[in-house]
């Protein structure tokens, strides 16, 4: 199965012709769900095998404006609207298209709420980071445990989208206008001028993976502050 985010994968069905690989686009709005499903239907005579709805409480890059993220928008209606869009294509293609809700799923009540809205599954990331089973660096896990609600902020990314991350020493400097010009451009983004960006996102995510948390971009979900110790998935 290919889960595709950071934009709408308009030509994905073309690449998968003749294969049994399943397609699961990530959407954040009724509009984006309508666009990708309509495009696939008309251009490729195909539809999704699963839809993942990533809401405004998710970590990392987000498909919302900064204003939307700061307004605490009520997202339930959007989820139900996307589910209604999916039902049209379930009927047309005579197949089940499970809808999975992601973003802010931090406890059983959030899971139940997602199912009550009509979802068939949930996607959880942040809650599993501070666990023994997670293979993230221990320093990275500790940042989640130390984080308070006010430490979790919306940040500007070189990718051009807002994101949610922990405000550490590095991010405080970025917020205050300091720039970190990369020593070497890796060419990971098509539209990126190393002289203009506040920092190299690849470089800072590598620091996170290596546990250099004072220098890293520490993406997290909105509820990261709710965990105060390393637990186990079991």
What are these model-predicted stretches?
Residues 1-93:
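Active-site entrance/lid segments in N-terminal catalytic domains of soluble metabolic enzymes
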Residues 5, 103-104:
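Charged, low-complexity surface patches
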Residues 58-100, 106-234:
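Conserved active-site-proximal phosphate/metal-binding subdomains
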């Amino acid at each position: 199965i290919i889960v595709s985010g950071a934009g709408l994968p308009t030509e994905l069905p073309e690449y998968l012709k003749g294969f049994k690989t399943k397609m699961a686009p990530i959407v954040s709005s009724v509009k984006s769900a309508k666009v990708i499903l309509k495009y696939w239907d008309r251009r490729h005579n195909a539809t999704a095998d699963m839809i993942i709805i990533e809401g405004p409480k998710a970590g990392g890059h987000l498909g919302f404006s900064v204003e939307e993220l700061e307004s605490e928008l009520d997202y339930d209606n959007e989820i139900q609207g996307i589910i209604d869009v999916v039902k049209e294509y379930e009927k047309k293609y005579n197949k089940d298209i499970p809808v999975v809700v992601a973003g802010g799923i931090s406890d059983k009540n959030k899971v139940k709420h997602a199912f009550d809205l009509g979802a068939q599954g949930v996607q959880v990331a942040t809650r599993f980071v501070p666990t023994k089973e997670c293979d993230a660096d221990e320093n990275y896990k500790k940042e989640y445990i130390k984080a308070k609600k006010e430490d979790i902020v919306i940040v500007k990314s070189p990718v051009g989208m807002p994101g949610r991350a922990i405000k550490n020493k590095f991010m405080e400097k970025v917020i205050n206008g300091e720039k970190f010009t990369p020593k070497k451009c890796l060419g990971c983004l098509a539209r990126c001028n190393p002289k203009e960006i506040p920092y190299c996102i690849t470089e800072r995510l590598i620091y996170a993976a290596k546990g250099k948390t004072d220098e890293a971009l520490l993406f997290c979900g909105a509820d990261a502050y709710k965990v105060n110790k390393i637990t186990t998935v079991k």
